[in-house]
Amino acid sequence: MSVVDQKQQYNLNKLQKRLRRDVGQAIADFNMIEEGDRIMVCLSGGKDSYTLLSILQNLQKSAPVNFSLVAVNLDQKQPGFPEHILPAYLGELGVEYKIVEENTYGIVKEKIPEGKTTCSLCSRLRRGILYRTATELGATKIALGHHRDDILQTLFLNMFYGGKLKGMPPKLMSDDGKHIVIRPLAYCREKDIERYATAKAFPIIPCNLCGSQPNLQRQVIKDMLREWDKRYPGRIETMFRAVQNVVPSHLSDFNLFDFKSITHGSEVIDGGDLAFDREELPMQPVVDIEDQPNYQSERLDIIEVK
């Protein structure tokens, strides 16, 4: 192996280790996977779901609990959908899988006028089919491929357009109240997933086969966050930490905190008015050490990318 190949392998190993660490931490923090779980991994053919399946398979080998995986793809009969790609890939991978064929594309085209965004109806139909499939397969958890950037984008979408301080939960009960949905990539950065997908040469299937107009608001938010990440290194990390460090007494939601009960003699909560002023905030957000140009790991990572 040449020096260049060795360096590439080393970088890939380090990247995989980082993703394993982030996924493992999210699983532990939110108790996503338990002993005996049967995890239905929703596979769209995009970089996120491929990475999710790959990392979960990798974690299976060393996880402290036993769990099984079944990959599920919904073939919505979109024109040009390459039906052969996923069965060939999953068959070679050796993972249990199921391809569900439902002509939701035809239903959406019939209901939504030409030129209008079809994503909302399409996602509702897809969600119902996946819930039904999870029941048929005896899955105890449904795993989706949303990552940290998706969570932050949703937070800003709700703030800017919905008037809500609401993001995307790493774990939740499904709409029908019968399934637990998990997002093991919740701590993973999209740029890490992109690099991993490229390195693993996943057979990516385009997400715009339906011809629907993209969610323009989400794209605006995505572009904004990417620009911030370039201009202000560490800002994205700091914002995500904020989502995990909420202080209800210093917001204005009276359903979340009982402001009416505060009277003379009440105890000072979370530092009172001085909670913000006392803190010495850094001039620049803290950047992940592994993003530093001259960062060198103190030990070799022997986890091989396979």
Swiss-Prot record:
It is found in: Cytoplasm. Catalyzes the ATP-dependent 2-thiolation of cytidine in position 32 of tRNA, to form 2-thiocytidine (s(2)C32). The sulfur atoms are provided by the cysteine/cysteine desulfurase (IscS) system. Pathway: tRNA modification. Its cofactor is Mg(2+); [4Fe-4S] cluster. It is an enzyme of class 2 (transferase). A motif (PP-loop motif) lies at residues 44-49. Binds 1 [4Fe-4S] cluster per subunit. The cluster is chelated by three Cys residues, the fourth Fe has a free coordination site that may bind a sulfur atom transferred from the persulfide of IscS. It comes from Photorhabdus laumondii subsp. laumondii (strain DSM 15139 / CIP 105565 / TT01) (Photorhabdus luminescens subsp. laumondii). GO terms for molecular function: 4 iron, 4 sulfur cluster binding; ATP binding; magnesium ion binding; sulfurtransferase activity; tRNA binding. It comes from the Bacteria. [4Fe-4S] cluster binds at C119, C122, C210. The thiolation reaction likely consists of two steps: a first activation step by ATP to form an adenylated intermediate of the target base of tRNA, and a second nucleophilic substitution step of the sulfur (S) atom supplied by the hydrosulfide attached to the Fe-S cluster. Belongs to the TtcA family. Homodimer. Its EC number is 2.8.1.-. HAMAP family: TtcA (MF_01850). GO terms for cellular component: cytoplasm. PANTHER family: AMINOTRAN_5 DOMAIN-CONTAINING PROTEIN, SULFURTRANSFERASE-RELATED. GO terms for biological process: tRNA thio-modification. It catalyses: cytidine(32) in tRNA + S-sulfanyl-L-cysteinyl-[cysteine desulfurase] + AH2 + ATP = 2-thiocytidine(32) in tRNA + L-cysteinyl-[cysteine desulfurase] + A + AMP + diphosphate + H(+). Keywords: 4Fe-4S, ATP-binding, Cytoplasm, Iron, Iron-sulfur, Magnesium, Metal-binding, Nucleotide-binding, RNA-binding, Transferase, tRNA processing, tRNA-binding. This is tRNA-cytidine(32) 2-sulfurtransferase. Signal peptide: none annotated. Pfam families: ATP_bind_3.
